[in-house]
Amino acid sequence: MGNGERPPARRPDSSGSPPPAADAPAASNHPFSSHDTKHMTSRRLASRTAVAASLSALMLAACGGDDSANAPTAGGAAPLTPAVASPAGPTGSTPGSTPGATTAPAPSSTSAGQLSVDKMAFAQTHVVPSGGLSWTLPNASASLRPISRRDALVLVAIGQADAVQPVLEAWKDGAKLGALALSPPSALPPTESGGRAYANDRWSAVVPAAWMVPGVSFSVSASNYTSSVAQAPVFGTDADVQLTILPFYLFGADDTNSPPLSTTQAPDAATQQEIFAKWPTAELKVRTHPAGRFSLATVVVGPRADRTGAAQPAYPVTALDQQKDGYGVMSAMLTLITNMRTANGDGPLNNQYYAPLIALNSNGQFANLGGGLGGVGSGAAVGDHRYTGIFIHEQGHAFGLNHAGDEYAKGAYPYAGGSLSGSVWGYDPNHREFLDVLVPTTASSYAKCASSHQLDAQGRCYKQDPMQGGAGDQSSGYKFATFSDYNTGRMQAWIASRVLADPASSTGYSKWDSAAQARAPYTPTTDNNGLYGVNQNLPVQAGVPVHTIVVSFSKAGSAGASYIYPPFSYTGNLIATFDPTSAADRQAITVDKGTYPWYCKGTGCDYTLRVTYADGSRTYRVLQGGFRAWWTPTVDDANATNPLSGSSFRVWAINVPGDKRIGKIELLDTPMVWNGMPANPTVLLSR
């Protein structure tokens, strides 16, 4: 864009305080969704289907405590006009078809003596036809494709009842990769909780991840028939997802009085396997943040309404029961972890951050958090340490999912009331069983689901999506409920949209090209003239010692709300930032004239961080964003000094070089610093 073009719409700012949404539990000032529900070696989870066969995932919304309170009633909103349906897989009430989604037709033109394949699908998170699924809704669209480079259970319906010893053949570039004997329908994996069979006519085999790649086609032959017409699946991204866990121990919580780090720093192995089974990724890598944990005695909650709905100024908290509403501390911690993720250069990448919050009340007792928060599409969420329904729901928000019932009402979710009525069935490779769209008999919600769930013609309950009251709809032995095919497709789209750190790329980065079904080299660019950072805030130095510094500041002067958090140090990344003592750096961020002319134009550049190291050396960094009126960086916002407005409060996070110990951290007042650095700037805060 040219410097003189119309300003872009203001992006919701996790550092500041956008207006709350109408359904917040208490009016909030953060663009996040809520849900009332020691350093270690990175864990890598590749696809486990083959092993299982052989051995046996910015607006505010609120949820209720156990996730069931938000389930719609059986007589929910009238259905929206669905996407054009083309039967090709199981329905919600009758196994064997796919309503609500458009599927690609199977190849035809079978000749005499040639085996015919009526249906071919691949079970990974869901049973998906080889051509994928797609939806066009009044206010949204989505698709779900087979996941590239992930094992799959292939399901084949053969046209001839007398086919003998059918075999699945894989081909690429005219070469045969191999063949797999198909197991008969009688050997099809069972359904969870001993439920109804998925189908009675599907032959099956486990296809290795190496064959589940673009360019591979599959055909079926038999000893008494020649090979069928080949089908080439349309694949989705082969990207992995890295899940980074950073536990926050708050208000004196430690291993002696609270769940220890050994249990909070990562989900256990079985839970990691179940997360992988639910998320449409080729690989799941779980790691504890290299800092281990973040221990805080004080947390600053930004301006927000209390439990009665009355607006409150920003305030410090030193015990969980001091917060004035149920989401105050969670909101503050979500802002911190979101900004820390950006400061570490992880913002555009294929990763998710989750922060278990371990907190004490004023009596020194461990406090039950009772919920979580997730920034919609932000890649970050906070919640409890149990890694159950709260976790999977909040990370759903981090993937870009809103509450499914709300989205259905807005024409952006295809199934009534946020249910799975119309979704294809799911599949779990760890248990090696199908996941019905109906609530199983062993689910905790089963006995009373009729009063809160959508019902089929026989009065049976459809599952709710985890983004709308689904917790409790899973079979005994599972931690997580089943996502709909539609929401899984949206998670796949989020993953496909991410930048991948890719050593095989000439630029070091790649992105998935959906049309080409391949990764393409990606060159980072600076969008919007630097309005939201340089080169998408990707690292300029990676794997180096860093100190992360977080500062909260109340321009209204709210008591205790201006605070420099204790820094923490680890091996991380540095993104492009600017030194206001450097004339070249000041020129680069000069409003409307510099190399990055919009870097300071949004809400100003009026504050500088000065870090003095133990050896006496110093580093200075401009803190982007402040309290100016949008697109008028020389004039204060009308609410900049209103203590009840989010516009008076900001949280910055920045990484600085960590090769030396810090002696002092100071926040300096440097108005319109692109015009020049004051010789003796006022020190606003010091630590």
From Swiss-Prot:
Residues involved in Zn(2+) binding: H393, H397, H403
Record-level Gene Ontology MF annotations: metal ion binding; metalloendopeptidase activity
Listed EC numbers: 3.4.24.-
Transmembrane segments: none
Chain ranges of the Peptidase M66 domain: 233-501
Alphabetically ordered keywords of this record: Hydrolase, Metal-binding, Metalloprotease, Protease, Zinc
Pfam families, alphabetized: Peptidase_M66
Swiss-Prot/TrEMBL cofactor(s): Zn(2+)
Gene Ontology terms: biological process: proteolysis
Record region (Disordered): 1-45, 73-112
Active site: E394
CC cofactor note: Binds 1 zinc ion per subunit.
Family under the similarity heading: Belongs to the dictomallein family.
Protein name in the entry: Dictomallein
Gene: dtmL
